[in-house]
From Swiss-Prot:
GO process annotations (BP): tRNA-guanine transglycosylation
Keyword Isomerase annotated: no
Binding-site residues for queuine, renumbered to this chain: 105-109, 159, 202, 229
Name the record gives this protein: Queuine tRNA-ribosyltransferase catalytic subunit 1
Enzyme class: transferase
Transmembrane residue ranges: none
Principal subcellular localisation of the protein: cytoplasm
Endpoints of the signal sequence: none
One matching Pfam family: TGT
Reactions it catalyzes: guanosine(34) in tRNA + queuine = queuosine(34) in tRNA + guanine
Gene3D superfamilies hit by this protein: Queuine tRNA-ribosyltransferase-like
GO molecular function: metal ion binding; protein heterodimerization activity; protein homodimerization activity; tRNA-guanosine(34) queuine transglycosylase activity
Membrane topology: Peripheral membrane protein
Organism (species): Mus musculus (Mouse)
Length: 403
């Protein structure tokens, strides 16, 4: 079935992005997202809280770290506790006591993560609940209905997600279906004045399919666009080229959200390619394995070399963990049955991600982003000759030479 040829009915989508500065050499941009629960400075990293909370950190702590937007998961929240209960709590903001902005994903990613429990048809995604086995249909209309009830500031269209390593006819089918589903999401959206619906670009690693999707979806006047279908196991060389293709065709005056990206090098490179927003479970997940993010990569604090190391994770980090606890203390906690260490590492890792993007933004505002990138890479890898080839190539494509 071909893609729907006529754009959806959403008219005069709000302009939520204000560009403040642009790098004179690369595609890096600094901006502001003007959202119902406050302004968000971009580029921005958005921590992920699947079920109205982040593992290992409270909303109060997240607030104190300077986070002004985080994520919730429509699929999981739609199943438990359910949209009706959350609506009675004045939406997801009230339910989780979060005063700042929220972005909810559509549930589409669960087509990949819960592949054995799902089946995709034109109607929507048929899931078997991982909680009780009950059959449920997540259609574009139902996804938007749930997100309208949640009251999130940014909502995502339901898209047909396939793994980035999949090739063949399914990739084209999923791309065209995502365009059709976007129109259904636009038609079903009840609160366009209060909630900003983003489209999600699909097309896998096929440049022609992704170009077709970009041309079709940018005909729809939605408030923002996400780059989907990447960061799922493809090579980094393939990854950055699809990101660059996408940003080259997306409207300059609307936010560009690169989904599922959270490694520090990836963040810096993709800002250079023109992306504004990022999310990933990486900083919280890696904390649960005893890994602390630092400018040189990460510290595996379970290793015995840290048993008598009384320095903080990062002496220059202002987060509560680094201001209060030593590597030796965290090492000892990690080797006990106490889960407190995971909490301390989660606080630090999220702080690291937020500080990194804040530093990136400052460098763009001060027109020193290329120098920032070179210093970042030198610190991370020790020598530019040791930088990943894909990152060197990607940065060179936008005029930032590491050598």
């Amino acid at each position: 079935m071909a893609a729907v040829g006529s754009p959806g009915s959403l008219e005069s989508a709000p302009r939520i992005m204000r560009l403040v500065a642009e790098c004179s050499r690369s595609g890096a941009r600094a901006g502001e997202l003007r959202l119902p629960h406050g302004t968000v400075a971009t580029p921005v990293f958005m921590p992920v809280g699947t079920q109205a909370t982040m593992k290992g950190i409270t909303t109060e702590q997240l607030d104190s770290l300077g986070c002004r937007i985080c994520l919730g998961n429509t699929y999981h929240l739609g199943l438990r506790p359910g949209p009706e209960l959350i609506r009675k709590a004045q939406g997801l903001h009230g339910f989780m006591n979060w005063p700042h902005n929220l972005l909810t994903d559509s549930g589409g990613f669960q087509m990949v993560s819960l592949f054995s429990l799902s089946e995709v048809t034109e109607e929507g995604v048929h899931f078997r609940s991982p909680y009780d086995g009950e059959e449920t249909l997540l259609s574009p209309e139902r996804s938007v209905e749930i997100q309208n009830a949640l009251g999130s500031d940014i909502i995502m269209q339901l898209d047909h997600v396939v793994s980035s390593t999949v090739t063949g006819p399914l990739v084209e089918e999923a791309m065209h279906r995502s365009v059709r589903w976007l129109d259904r999401c636009i038609a079903a959206h009840k609160h366009p004045d209060k909630q900003n619906l983003f489209a999600i670009i699909q097309g896998g690693l096929n440049a022609d399919l992704r170009t077709t999707c970009l041309k079709e979806m940018t005909k729809r006047d939605v408030p923002g666009f996400a780059i989907g279908g990447l960061s799922g196991g493809e090579s980094k060389a393939q990854f950055w080229k699809m990101v660059a293709l996408s940003t080259s065709m997306l409207p300059k005056d609307k936010p560009r959200y690169l989904m599922g990206v959270g490694y520090a090098t990836d963040l810096v490179v993709c800002v250079a390619l023109g992306c504004d927003m990022f999310d990933c479970v990486y900083p919280t997940r890696t904390a649960r394995f005893g890994s602390a993010l630092v400018p040189t990569g990460n510290l595996q604090l379970k290793k015995k070399q840290y048993a008598k190391d009384f320095s903080p994770i990062n002496p220059e980090c202002p987060c509560p963990t680094c201001q209060t606890h030593s590597r030796a203390f965290l090492h000892a906690l990690l080797h006990s049955d106490n889960t407190t260490a995971l909490h301390h590492l989660t606080v630090h890792n999220i702080a690291y991600q937020l500080q990194l993007l804040s530093a990136v933004r400052s460098s763009i505002l001060e027109q020193r982003f290329p120098d920032f990138v070179r210093n970042f890479m030198r610190t991370m890898y020790g020598d530019h000759s040791l930088c990943p080839a894909w990152a060197v190539e990607a940065l060179a494509s936008v005029g930032i030479m590491l050598t």
